[in-house]
Amino acid sequence: MNKYEMFFKVQNDYQPSPYVQVVKRLDPGMYKVTYDDMTDSVTFKVMESNHDELVDLPETEYDAVVSDVDLFLRPETEAKFKEMGFIHKFNILLHGPPGTGKTCLVNRVAQKLIAANAIVLFNPQPYALQKTYEILDAIQPDTRILVIFEEMDEHVRREETALLHVLDGEVQKKNAMYIATSNYIEKIPARVRRPGRFSSVI
């Protein structure tokens, strides 16, 4: 059995592949999510972070993102969101030409959140997140989530409606942070990257 694959059974009459392990809870870490609409099931495949890609980054950019992460992790922040009637979540958009350190920065943030017992979902299809969130809410509702959308412009091109439902529509998740990256921010319509949708655009 592949130890890097885990499967949550969501239908009693469906038997998972013998190569997939059934688990009751996800450990902190980074996962690739696959949704099977025929069986209405979600598979989480463990990914390993690439520490070799961590390089020096402009301190102002790194500090700005880490400041948002630290704010997100504070219990008083969650309490304040709840008091105001808002869902506790943060959305960050990182942009710039290839080679400017976006991936390295995302890796650092992912490691910081994993160390705080979070689950990281790497580049999921937006339409698959509704079922993913239903499962996570059922088994570990208070776990913090980091969702990474690489090449945000491509997600917008293929699944804009589903993406917007996730970011601030019908498919929202409490205790979730979203980090989207793009090499070509001009390809993302202004309505998608408006300030009210992203707390930080860096």
Question: Over which residues does each language-model region extend?
Answer:
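The start of beta-strands in P-loop NTPase/AAA+ ATPase cores
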Residues: 90, 145-146, 177
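Short glycine-rich substrate-engagement loop in P-loop NTPases that contacts/grips substrate
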Residues: 114-143, 160-161
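Structural recognition of the conserved hydrophobic beta-strand(s) that form the central parallel beta-sheet
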Residues: 149-150, 176-183
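A short helix-turn-beta junction within AAA+ P-loop NTPase domains corresponding to the substrate/partner-engaging
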Residues: 190-202
